[in-house]
Amino acid sequence: MIKQYFKQALSQLKQQPLLTTISVLGTALTICLIMVVVMQQQIKTVPFAPESNRNRLLHVKWMSVGNKTWSDDGSSNGPMGIKTAKGCFEGLKTPEEVSIYSIPGTMQVSLSRGVRTGVDALETDGAFWRIFDFSFIDGKPYSDAETKSGLPVAVITESVARLLFGTATNVAGKEIFVNDAPYRVSGVVKDVSSMASTAYAQIWVPYLSTNITGGDNVWNDGIMGVMQVVILARNSSDFDVIRAECERRRLAYNAGLGDYFVFYRGQPDDQLTMSQRIWANVQPDMAGYFRQQVIIFLILLLVPAINLSSMTHSRLRQRVAEIGVRRSFGATRGGVMGQIVAENLVLTLMAGVVGLLFCLLISYVWGGTLFADSQLMHLNTAPVIEWKMLFKLSTFIYALLF
């Protein structure tokens, strides 16, 4: 029976090639657009290595500080200083881990004090390596003790190791120069896609091995700086409890700041909210975001559906004579309708396959532009896009059903 439906669908394609082709391509384009839009959102929230725990992560990207002597709406906004990160978040009891790390930056690496290469860098603590699941090719991450001691150790990516040493193995323990300072390579990890917006870098070093926590990198009595915080909950159901604990720590921290006081603007954020928090002084409007997504999907679904329905109506009108003949030879109304529906489902399935191919082609050719994080566009490397990061079978099925 199914084979017969396919034959009849192909027959319709031959009899009405223009209408059928437009119908198939229109449906395919709709499915393609829906999948691309969904994947643009998924890449920000769906777990993939090394951010496999995204569903359990909370983020504090920005901090706001006010002063009792400033105007009512006066505030300084941006990354926090190490003093604030430790005072408000270090040692939280509810979560599994808390990591303090720097905003993305660039460091110069070399094997000598001669020719240097710029690479994307993060400065972290030891907990960072327990939150994110990097794949180590050689060596291991630096420890909490090495971080607290400010030892000059570094983890580098496979591509950086090959650039410096010509190989990614047997590199641990060797010396490199980072911003003209000697560092020991602690480990080598597989290259990380910049789509992993929190974990991504090409080199990671302990934040106490540089001057990033002092000097010109802090202001407002050390309250503000260049640090951020990521929290790994034991379970996503603990998010509200963790936020409440963070609020208690904030109040206790403010008690020792004199005229200054810090506030979170709704943070810590889950992964989705964090992806929409662009500005340090503006809390994201998540209700508006969801409304916008609904409107986009309605437009993507309704406009092609209205156009395609008129084409389907034209096709059916041309088959009125055929339907009349079949009815006169004893075919039931339900049987005729069922066959027409089945034929249209076959055409929809064909369109779905074409739409999937369109989507994969677009993702392959323009993926770096479509899915790049605008906040990381200044980095040295182009975004690495892998199919397993983007394509979910459920996305294709939902797009096909709608």
State each model region's role.
Residues 18-29, 321-367, 394-398:
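Transmembrane alpha-helical interface segments in multi-pass membrane proteins
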Residues 15-44, 283-321, 349:
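Hydrophobic alpha-helical transmembrane segments of multi-pass inner-membrane transport and secretion
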Residues 271-273, 365-381:
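Peri-membrane helix termini and adjoining interfacial loops of integral membrane proteins
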Residues 375-402:
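Hydrophobic alpha-helical transmembrane segments of polytopic membrane proteins
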Residues 127-141, 152-283:
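Mid-to-C-terminal secondary-structure elements
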Residues 5-14, 85-88:
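A short amphipathic helical element positioned immediately N-terminal to and/or at the very start
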Residues 78-141, 259-260:
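Short amphipathic beta-strand/extended segments in non-transmembrane regions
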Residues 37-108, 223-228, 376-380, 384:
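Membrane-proximal extracellular/periplasmic loop immediately following the first transmembrane helix
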